[in-house]
Amino acid sequence: MITRFAPSPTGYMHVGNARTALICWLYARSKSGKFLLRIDDTDASRSEHKYIEGIKQDLDWLALDWDSCFQQSTRLERYQEVFDLLLDQGVIYPCYETQEELDMKRSMMLKMGLPPIYDRSALKMTEQEMQACSGRLPYFRLKIDQSREITWEDEVRGRVSFQAKNISDPIIKRTDGTYTYMFPSVVDDIDFAITHIIRGEDHVSNTATQICIFDILKAKVPVFVHLPLVHFRDAKISKRVGSDDIEIRHLRDIGMEPMAIKSYLARMGTSLPVEPQENHDVLVESFDIRTFNQAPIKFSLDDISRLNSRIVQCLSFDKVKDRFVQQGLECTEEFWYLIRDNVNTVEDVREWINICNSQITTAIDDKDRTFISEAKALLPDTELDEEVCKAWLQRIKETSNRSTRDVLLPLRLATTGVTTGPGLAQLLPFIGRAEVVRRLECASKGHNAN
């Protein structure tokens, strides 16, 4: 098995095409096959080098390794070779309509209730019409056998059929000499022996046309898999939705773990449960294209965030310590295991370091100020450790006649500035006695600890 992921470098990778890449990769790896990365950059006016690098960076970050990679812009001679062959065979023909003329034809056919299929007028041009087009650069179409039925067994959609008479002869070369998507894609799939083509359902009509090109070139037609499109905020996801929220680089920047994204994207739209996975081995071993369905899929950042929290809260110190160094964070193993259950991303450890070592803002009720002052008076005159803090909290509870909650909440606010977090007896030693005393003093007087 050989699959390929073929992005156009006209934007940064988003969750929609990342899902396609992941499924191509999982399918290949589950069958001990190969995964190819093909950069579809034949449209030089829209392709940018920064997007090529961005695609590779995102795939690398997601640990979706490829067995080979190439850019279509390096294979133009090969496309020309096949183009010339088909031109000599009369399968490709030149056309001279302007875009305005084509738009007018399309509009007229739609008004007549007819499918907007190209009328092949370029094949019927008189000598006078040819002279009228003198000086115009031609574009080229590939002639399809319109008497045939195009059928394939899609691994998600089942049997799919098209009547070729309802399909326009595809434009394969523009007036400026550049190729459209259709033609180079098929040439590459043949030359690189692609066995399975996995992509979004918006390519179904393209597949019908491309099967015709495979047949014209007398090549074996690959297996096709068309996945339902991912929706985001009621819009189909594409590189032009205009929201950074769906870009992989954005998810990386806000602290999402690669495995959270992969755990989510690999199972969404399947009959399998979406669960956090520690590594992708389980995803590879459990992958089965038959579990995918045709129902629309809605992307939820909240769902990924929940998976992310569960994954982060299971990370060992060995897996995060180098990241702390890279981020300039001084986080010990003991501190990580203390606050781990209270973070949603690895970066959140910075907040807890700041709580322990920086200024905090508190909002203590007036009714609790006397209580805070009395609690401070009970603090032992010794360095804090977990046992000392437990004994202190127990003594406060006994002398104040307050419930555990009414003891802990104001003390937590006074010493940390937040209402939730790790056990107070375990956290206070990291703040240190002198700072705890200062914060209690400020809180008892209604001041911020700054």
Curated annotation (Swiss-Prot):
Entry keywords, A to Z: Aminoacyl-tRNA synthetase, ATP-binding, Cytoplasm, Ligase, Nucleotide-binding, Protein biosynthesis
One Pfam entry name: Anticodon_2
CC terms in the record's Gene Ontology section: cytoplasm
Entry's EC annotation: 6.1.1.17
Localization (cell): Cytoplasm
Presence of the UniProt keyword NADP in the record: no
Sequence motif: 'KMSKS' region, positions: 236-240
SUPFAM superfamilies registered for this protein in UniProt: An anticodon-binding domain of class I aminoacyl-tRNA synthetases (SSF48163), Nucleotidylyl transferase (SSF52374)
Motif 'HIGH' region, chain ranges: 7-17
Molecular-function GO term, any one: ATP binding
Ligand binding (ATP): 239
Highest taxon of the lineage: Bacteria
Membrane-crossing residue ranges in chain numbering: none
Catalytic activity: tRNA(Glu) + L-glutamate + ATP = L-glutamyl-tRNA(Glu) + AMP + diphosphate
PROSITE patterns: AA_TRNA_LIGASE_I
InterPro entries tied to this protein: aa-tRNA-synth_I_cd-bd (IPR045462), aa-tRNA-synth_I_codon-bd_sub2 (IPR020751), aa-tRNA-synth_I_CS (IPR001412), aa_tRNA-synth_I_cd-bd_sf (IPR008925), Glu-tRNA-ligase_bac/mito (IPR004527), Glu/Gln-tRNA-synth (IPR000924), Glu/Gln-tRNA-synth_Ib_cat-dom (IPR020058), GluQ/Sye (IPR049940)
Annotated GO biological process: glutamyl-tRNA aminoacylation
Record's function text: Catalyzes the attachment of glutamate to tRNA(Glu) in a two-step reaction: glutamate is first activated by ATP to form Glu-AMP and then transferred to the acceptor end of tRNA(Glu).
Quaternary structure, from the entry: Monomer.
Family of this protein: Belongs to the class-I aminoacyl-tRNA synthetase family. Glutamate--tRNA ligase type 1 subfamily.
Name of protein: Glutamate--tRNA ligase 1
Organism per entry: Anaplasma phagocytophilum (strain HZ)
